[in-house]
Amino acid sequence: MKNILDFTLEELKEWMKENGESAFRAKQIFDWIYKKEVFNFEEMKNISKALIGKLSENFYIGIPEVIDYLSSSEDGTRKILLGLGDGNIIECVIMRYKYGNSICVSTQIGCRMGCKFCASTLEGMVRNLTAGEILSEVLIGQKLLGERISNIVLMGSGEPLDNYDNVMKFLELVNADYGLNIGQRHITLSTCGLVPKIREMADKEMQVTLAISLHAVSDEKRKTIMPIANKYSISEILDACNYYIEKTGRRITFEYSLVSGVNDTKEDAKSLGRLLKGMLCHVNLIPVNEIKENEFKKSTKKDIETFLNTLKTYGVEATVRREMGSDINAACGQLRRSYIKSKGLKL
């Protein structure tokens, strides 16, 4: 049995022809799934019983079970805990902005990158999500919300470029006009800096916004909080980013989690300003999410403001990320981890 959400329209048309059906049936089925949010073959009214039988024998519509659905009383942020068919659990977050609804999706179950301040990496890597499983987060999120999701950020659990092929196919599926038709410029992909994959993605000349999890201004300091820094230097990452800008014309976002006493001094801000001065980029300053498993503390408001203002003196565009859903632990990995522990399950 295959997850039909993993299929492109052309792939499903080919299956139809191979199984004695008209190719146009593929579009009808996808209309039911993507336009009408019908996730059961039996409910597709203009599909013959014979074809429904064939579909049921060969495919399933991989919509996950909703285990928990939390809504923030502060800002309307929604956090969804989802159960997959194999018993694994993932989570996604919907954030409401003036310009529309944005969903933060997971691309892996767990993560093997080992970043010290991230909850999703604490139990290590379980497995990659397929393109259809990533897509299902958007589908179920949109159905639960009852409104269109217009923006996607690949910033949930997992390193997207460590699941490159599935993520690239997801981007194709979610952008397709027969599907959700979410434009590439409305999608942001966050990576800790897998240099070869950044360059490979640049060669596709996609219009996806690339966000780099930087979090330190020297290789030495970065190695203490991000193991990937032992493989790729900041210089190599910046070279890859400039290549991405050259190929796509898109501005790079640099994510910088501010950790009290670790990377939030005025000297750190000056070093970051010198590093990025003149580059087509934007810095997103993130007050770190505190988790029990480490001792990292959030920077003070005064230190955050000083850091921000110092960056601006170098002509570097920067903003402080608005904290959303703090009353429901909306940071990636937190809800999944607390749920698994509460049930006494193995991480």
From Swiss-Prot:
Q: What molecular functions are annotated in GO for this chain?
A: 4 iron, 4 sulfur cluster binding; metal ion binding; rRNA (adenine(2503)-C2-)-methyltransferase activity; rRNA binding; tRNA (adenine(37)-C2)-methyltransferase activity; tRNA binding
Q: Which reaction does it catalyse?
A: adenosine(2503) in 23S rRNA + 2 reduced [2Fe-2S]-[ferredoxin] + 2 S-adenosyl-L-methionine = 2-methyladenosine(2503) in 23S rRNA + 5'-deoxyadenosine + L-methionine + 2 oxidized [2Fe-2S]-[ferredoxin] + S-adenosyl-L-homocysteine; adenosine(37) in tRNA + 2 reduced [2Fe-2S]-[ferredoxin] + 2 S-adenosyl-L-methionine = 2-methyladenosine(37) in tRNA + 5'-deoxyadenosine + L-methionine + 2 oxidized [2Fe-2S]-[ferredoxin] + S-adenosyl-L-homocysteine
Q: Where in the cell is it found?
A: Cytoplasm
Tell me which residues make up the Radical SAM core domain.
97-327
What is a single Pfam family found in this protein's UniProt entry?
Radical_SAM
Stated role: Specifically methylates position 2 of adenine 2503 in 23S rRNA and position 2 of adenine 37 in tRNAs.
Q: What is this protein's record name?
A: Probable dual-specificity RNA methyltransferase RlmN
Origin organism is Clostridium perfringens (strain 13 / Type A)
Question: Its encoding gene is what?
Answer: rlmN
